[in-house]
């Protein structure tokens, strides 16, 4: 009986020592990993990385949007987006006009200018970029020649839905994220 008690207590001590060793090794390994690189723009990051909420990341654009824009709702038909220097850009996507974000959009008619070589989408993006920090997104509806730009300045979280021939862009690392 004494042998059995001693064996159980020995096993228990060995198990505790093993758990302590595993914890020490795990904590040491965590300390050895380099800290995430701090950034303001994509150029601050390495190849294949993008600046998401102030740190360099290899997240896909869609995952980055979900991390950057808390409580965003994205229709399941929307499966991708692209990084641009200042925006997350979605094609065939529109804001849901029944939700708070979509209710307060402001239209801006864009017509081609012979002196300008910018596409209507570029003009729409520049309008939002040159505006105040209150621009929380832009949407373009039209073709390559002319269309309507909608500028959003509502800090509510966007609800995005599928919208054929719509382009919507949400600012990256924005104060209303």
From Swiss-Prot:
Virion surface side: 29-177
Keywords noted in UniProt: Host cell membrane, Host membrane, Late protein, Membrane, Transmembrane, Transmembrane helix, Virion
Signals that turn on the gene: Expressed in the late phase of the viral replicative cycle.
Membrane topology (UniProt): Single-pass membrane protein
Chief place where the protein resides: virion
Intravirion compartment spans: 1-7
Compartment annotation: Virion membrane; Host cell membrane
Membrane-crossing segments per the record: 8-28
Gene Ontology CC terms: host cell plasma membrane; membrane; virion membrane
Organism domain of life: Viruses
Record family assignment: Belongs to the asfivirus inner membrane protein p22 family.
Full protein name: Inner membrane protein p22
């Amino acid at each position: 009986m004494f042998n059995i008690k001693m064996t159980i207590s020995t096993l228990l001590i060995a198990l505790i020592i093993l758990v302590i060793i595993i914890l020490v090794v795990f904590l040491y390994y965590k300390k050895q990993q380099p800290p995430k690189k701090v950034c303001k723009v994509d150029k601050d990051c390495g190849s294949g990385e993008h600046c998401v909420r102030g740190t360099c990341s290899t997240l896909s654009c869609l995952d980055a949007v979900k991390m950057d824009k808390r409580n965003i709702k994205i229709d399941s038909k929307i499966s991708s987006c692209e990084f641009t220097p200042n925006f997350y850009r979605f094609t065939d996507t529109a804001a849901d006009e029944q939700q708070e974000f979509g209710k307060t959009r402001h239209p801006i008619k864009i017509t081609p200018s012979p002196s300008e070589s910018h596409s209507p989408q570029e003009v729409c993006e520049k309008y939002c970029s040159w505006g105040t920090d209150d621009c929380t997104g832009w949407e373009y509806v039209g073709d390559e020649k002319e269309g309507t730009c909608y500028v959003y300045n509502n800090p509510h979280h966007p609800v995005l839905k599928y919208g054929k021939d719509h382009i919507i862009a949400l600012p990256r690392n924005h104060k209303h994220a």
